[in-house]
């Protein structure tokens, strides 16, 4: 009788251990799925933010300012202030994208695509002037990335 009780006790302990392992496996799988969902949400938020900024850049006032910049015309003090704010918001969005990338919420390929827009953005002397004015307000790692892209362009 002791043999049967020992055997049953061992069998039950083994089944409990197996159930624990299976539970851990399913917990890991669930965490992986939640991570995928979180990454997709981060990407969507970045996309929404980018779209919102792009739409702000399409207002008649901002289009006029952009056309002046493209034609190397001087901006009025009011236009300069408005564009400084717009440019700052645009860079803050990129800084947030870098943060999302640094914590693994945006993959490397996507981050590389985001960086491509910097290459055209910082060909403008006006944008370089704005960047030098405001760069100290950004995260050090982000500053290094932007400065590296600027150096690469020049």
PLM feature spans:
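Membrane-proximal alpha-helical anchors
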Residues: 2-75
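An amphipathic alpha-helical interaction surface
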Residues: 78-154
